[in-house]
Amino acid sequence: MIITTTPSIEGKNILEYKGVVFGEVISGVNFIKDFAAGLSNFFGGRSNTYEGELIEAREKAMKEMENRAIQIGANAVVGVDIDYEVLGADNGMLMVTASGTAVYYE
């Protein structure tokens, strides 16, 4: 399946717009990850702990969006946008939303 941020697929003819599809993931961050990330912040450098969590959440949201597109008969998703939001009383949860337009092309 083609998944792209562009509004069209170069060299392809979109025959049908199936509708908007979403993939959402909410991921909690626990104390051990917070502690490891805090050490990284204290000593400088990147937080591999949070980066890994972010990558995993994004990939899951993209896969969920793709699966929803397949369910409605699409073979591509165009105009994809990915949004990130921190949630929870202590900002302890990360929400990743992937959205785009499911299409059928030839």
Swiss-Prot record:
Pfam families: YbjQ_1
Recorded superkingdom: Bacteria
UniProt family annotation: Belongs to the UPF0145 family.
HAMAP family in the cross-refs: UPF0145 (MF_00338)
Name of the protein: UPF0145 protein CLL_A2504
Organism field: Clostridium botulinum (strain Eklund 17B / Type B)
Lineage: Bacteria, Bacillati, Bacillota, Clostridia, Eubacteriales
